[in-house]
């Protein structure tokens, strides 16, 4: 292979480093990089995306979007109008809490401290608690059907991919059972 299909770069790094932007432009021009995807992981980068949409030079953005974290919808719509790709991360709310905890916790009563108590990462995640809480905590159980104690993960994936402006949802699994549950929406 003579080219990278997708080069993922953190938005803040891309915007703050002119030499990086120039080098990526050169590599794209030379055919060494086919597509640039800006990662919108941090809150400031997410807000810029929600407010303005994609950067003109980017071919796609990787953004946080799920059933309980919908703040990216304006940016996603703007990206679609501009013909840009939209890749979704954290479709299942990230790895900070188990799916069981996401479904069984009463998030109307819970606080950020509840998230720290439930997460196996505990205090080590305090520095990014605002961000993690925004995409982990919320009414996941609303995705359950009558008689289900826990919403199937496929329901969360289905909710994300039903947005016609979403190009792709990145979903992580660790077992055949998790894979089958996530794919149940197809």
Predicted features and spans:
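Beta/alpha (TIM)-barrel catalytic core signal, keyed to glycine-rich beta->alpha loops juxtaposed to Asp/Glu
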Residues: 9-186
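Phosphate/pyrophosphate-binding loops at sites that engage ATP/ADP/AMP, CoA/4′-phosphopantetheine
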Residues: 1-2
């Amino acid at each position: 292979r003579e080219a990278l299909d997708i080069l993922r770069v953190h938005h803040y790094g891309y915007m703050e480093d002119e030499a990086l932007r120039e080098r990526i432009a050169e590599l794209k021009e030379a055919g060494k990089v086919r597509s640039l995807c800006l990662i919108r992981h941090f809150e400031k980068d997410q807000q810029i995306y929600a407010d303005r949409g994609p950067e003109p030079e980017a071919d796609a953005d990787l953004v946080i979007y799920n059933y309980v974290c919908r703040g990216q919808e304006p940016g996603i719509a703007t990206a679609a109008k501009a013909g840009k790709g939209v890749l979704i991360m954290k479709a299942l709310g990230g790895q900070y809490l188990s799916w069981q905890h996401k479904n069984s916790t009463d998030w109307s009563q819970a606080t950020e401290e509840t998230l720290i108590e439930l997460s196996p990462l505990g205090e080590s995640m305090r520095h990014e608690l605002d961000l993690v809480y925004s995409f982990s905590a919320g009414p996941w159980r609303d995705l359950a059907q009558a008689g289900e104690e826990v919403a199937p993960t496929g329901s969360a994936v289905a909710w994300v991919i039903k947005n016609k402006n979403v190009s792709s949802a990145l979903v992580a699994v660790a077992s055949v059972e998790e894979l089958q549950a996530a794919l149940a929406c197809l």
